[in-house]
Structure formats: C-alpha cells, structure tokens
A protein has these predicted regions:
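Amphipathic alpha-helical and helix-coil boundary elements used as assembly
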Residues: 2-336
Length: 336
C-alpha cells in the first residue's frame, strides 16, 4: 500500500530508541553531519573520511504515462489520465507508456492523477541512480549529502551535487586478536568479508605475520551505498502486489434475516465464500457483486436473482481479487 500511495520510510537511531519515520517527500529528510563529503581515490592518505569509488548511470524514459480505466456506472465514458515526465528534457514525448488499469481503477480524476504521478516518479527515481563506496562512518539511508572535489561535479550547481542515500551496506571488522587456527561456523560472514576487505598498500607481509602469530587483525570499515539526486522525488519501487487471482470459486448467496431475496438498485447480490469463517449468519460480509444475465440492454433483457443459500460461481475481472463477478449458479447436494 505504501508503494502505491508514494510513501516511504527511514529509521532515526538514538541512544535509547529507534524510530521509523514515514514520509512522502524528500524535503523532510535530514542532511548528514557534516553535510559535505569529499571524493578522493583509495591511494591517497587522508585524515578525513571520504568517498573512494563513484559511478552513475541513467535509463531512457517514456515522455508521458497514459492510463485508462472503465466504470460500469458510467458506461461508454472511460476514465483517462495523462501524466508527462518530470524529466522532460531526457524523455521524448513520442515515447508514450500506455497502461490499461482495469475496472474502476479510481473514482475521482484527482485520485487517478495522483496514482499515475506516483508511478512515473517511481520510474524516474530508478532511472538515475548513483553507486559508491566510502569510509564515511555517518552514512545512513534516508539522509542526503553534498559531494565535493569530484571532477565531474565541481562546476555544477549545488543542487546537482546533492544526493539522497537510498541504501547503505556497512562492513566493519575489529582489530582484536584472532586464533591462529579458526574454523568458519555455519552462517559465518567470513566469505563476505574476504570479498570486500581492502589490502593495505605495503602491509601485506605485516598482516600475514600478524595472522600467523594470532596477535590481531588490521581491521577495516567501509560501506557501499546507492542514491539519487536529492532534487528528484523518491518513490519506493513497486515490489509488493495483491495476491494473484485464485481462479473461479463458488460461494453461497447471503441475505439479511427474513429476506429470501436481497439486492441493491443494480440487482447486485452479496455472498459468503466457503473459506470465510468470520462472517455470521445473516451478515452481508462481501461487497455487492454484479451477476451475468442471459440478456441485458436498454429497456429489454431478463433478470434472475439468486435466492439465499443458493450456490454461485464467481470469477475475477482482470485477475484482480477486488473485482469479483458472478458468472452463474450451480446445483449442489442441497439443491437437486
């Protein structure tokens, strides 16, 4: 739900507690302290923490996102939204992304505009990412910083050198003495640490002697991070979806106590699925469901309404479990 609505979260760590903060804009995110972080290569000895590796990439995006949905209450009047790319300079308008959103995807136009805006911001957030490696100890996801002394960004405006940290992976090893003969236990992180542990220049022999004597390790700290421009809206990628359509199911028609037939003004009915163990007898525990009829049209057609306790077959439009449709009735042991 958060991904669909454009919400994301970060964690604030303090000495006595950890707090999860939800937000929908990068403007509320705090900066690192200090805010400016220098870039320098690994072969340079520095007294201050800095970023040692940096890479960036981008993808070609569509120039606009076009959505369409239909609602049977407004027959013949499809609902549409057209959302232009926020990064219009690098997204040709001719490259349109068209998506059909199924039955009654939104009720009001501003709701459809917001949902489509969130999706196009998801694409743009993922399209331009930076990756790096550093020894900066205060690196933390949900914070932003300003890059300095990088040759590709030195002449750019301040906002083009400000980056939001999306993910930070930290590796740290102490310099405590280790046993000469040690065995890796199941689930050990030793293999992962070997893949990232730096080899200090000129100290290879010293480290080998230290390992042999068991007097200690040189220890290290580094992190890998992913980020984006702070000026670009961040949206979590769509990675969590509704459960898949389970296929056609049967259910029992339910009505309030004392009613053999019960519908709304559109002749829709309520049902109780066989797996529903919470709904009570006589309770309308489902939404109103439309039912397929032998014929239907303006001023002609026929309608048959199932009675309480009768069994019906239900399918789901566009594989959406929130869009059930009654296909017809079936006989069972209680109704020969």
């Amino acid at each position: 739900w958060c991904e669909q609505e454009g919400l994301f979260w970060y964690v604030e760590h303090t000495a006595d507690k950890h707090c999860i903060v939800f937000t929908d804009t990068v403007d509320t995110l705090p900066a690192l302290a200090p805010q400016s972080i220098r870039f320098h290569t690994q072969n340079v000895t520095e007294k201050q923490d800095g970023i040692t590796q940096w890479s960036s990439g981008s993808q070609l995006l569509s120039g606009k996102l076009h959505w369409r949905s239909v609602d049977y209450l407004a027959h013949g009047q499809p609902r549409e939204t057209v959302m232009p790319s926020l990064q219009a300079a690098s997204a040709p308008q001719a490259l349109e992304r068209y998506e059909y959103q199924g039955q009654y995807g939104w009720q009001k136009q501003d709701r459809g505009q917001w949902l489509s805006r969130v999706q196009i911001e998801q694409h743009e957030s993922q399209a331009r990412r930076i990756q790096g490696q550093s020894g900066v100890r205060q690196m933390q996801a949900g914070r932003w910083f300003e890059l300095t002394q990088h040759p590709l960004y030195e002449r750019k405006a301040a906002e083009e050198r400000q980056f939001l940290l999306i993910e930070v992976e930290i590796f740290a090893e102490s310099n405590l003495p280790l046993a000469k003969e040690r065995r890796e236990v199941p689930g050990s992180l030793a293999a992962l640490f070997r893949s990232v542990r730096p080899e200090p220049s000129g100290l290879g022999v010293v480290n080998k002697v230290a390992d042999t004597l068991g007097v200690g390790s040189h220890g290290f700290f580094l992190n890998r991070f992913e980020g984006q421009l702070h000026s670009v809206p961040f949206r979590s990628p769509a990675e969590h979806f509704k459960p898949n359509n389970p296929g056609p199911q049967t259910a029992v028609v339910v009505t309030p106590s004392g009613h053999e037939v019960f519908t709304d003004t559109l002749n829709r009915i309520c049902v109780r699925f066989h797996w529903d163990r919470l709904s009570q007898e006589g309770e309308l525990g489902s939404c109103w469901l439309r039912m397929m009829q032998p014929s239907s049209g303006p001023d002609w057609g026929s309608v048959h309404v199932p009675r309480a306790g009768e069994e019906v077959v239900i399918t789901f439009l566009d594989n959406d479990i929130d869009r059930p449709l009654v296909m017809g009735q079936v006989y069972g042991g209680h109704k020969p």
